[in-house]
Design a protein with these regions (language model features):
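Short N-terminal edge-element motif at the start of the domain
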Residues: 1-50
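Beta-strand-rich cores of mature extracytoplasmic or soluble domains
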Residues: 75-175
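Short solvent-exposed strand/turn elements
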Residues: 52-77
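Residue-identity detector for threonine
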Residues: 19, 65-67, 87, 135
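Ordered hydrophobic segments in well-structured contexts
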Residues: 26-31, 38-45, 53-59, 79-84, ...
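Residue-level signal for the start and early helices of compact helical domains
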Residues: 4, 15, 21, 35-36, ...
Length: 175
């Protein structure tokens, strides 16, 4: 029995270089021009107050063109991170991040327990917010949320490090 392909609609790179914030959806597929010769793909997993939560796929290519078959075989790499989607997809002067598709049947439930912490980094009490927007009325101690990432957008240093580590594990081979 053949595995059913996900329901993904794909468009060409630069077909629509800018995506306004209000049109970014959970399940969107994006392409990021990681270097002059390399593109990487990923997916929007959720939305939090400060941006969108994404995760990269294990697909590194010399071209921003991808097929549904390639996406159906893709695995997530690294950790889920929050990006400043307004700046990257809507207002960037250089369109190195583009929404290139959408997975209609995307199921975010495997990420329902993904949470981030918020609060004063120097403080003693913190809050917790989940990917689906749930918040906990309880205040947590530093120890209780120590293993969580901050509900804050990460910059290129963080997401490029994730990608560089993956490439290093492959012996710097993109494909």
């Amino acid at each position: 029995m053949q595995k059913k392909l996900p329901q993904i609609k794909i468009r060409e790179w630069n077909e629509k270089p800018r995506t306004k914030m209000r049109f970014i959806k959970i399940g969107d597929i994006f392409c990021y021009q990681f270097s002059e010769e390399m593109f990487v793909f990923g997916q929007i997993l959720g939305k939090v107050n400060v941006g969108h939560v994404i995760q990269f796929f294990d697909i590194f290519q010399a071209s921003p063109t991808i097929t549904v078959e390639e996406l159906s075989r893709a695995q997530f790499i690294g950790k889920s991170i929050i990006i400043d989607s307004y700046t990257l997809f809507d207002r960037s002067p250089v369109w190195s991040w583009q929404i290139i598709g959408h997975q209609v049947d995307f199921d975010p439930s495997p990420f329902k327990d993904l949470a981030f912490k918020w609060g004063d980094p120097n403080g003693l009490q913190f809050g917790k917010v989940w990917l689906d927007g749930r918040t906990e009325p309880k205040i947590f101690s530093r120890e209780e949320v120590d293993d969580l990432d901050w509900e804050a957008c990460v910059g290129s240093i963080v997401y490029n490090r994730i990608l560089e580590e993956e490439l290093a594990s492959r012996g710097n081979k993109g494909v």
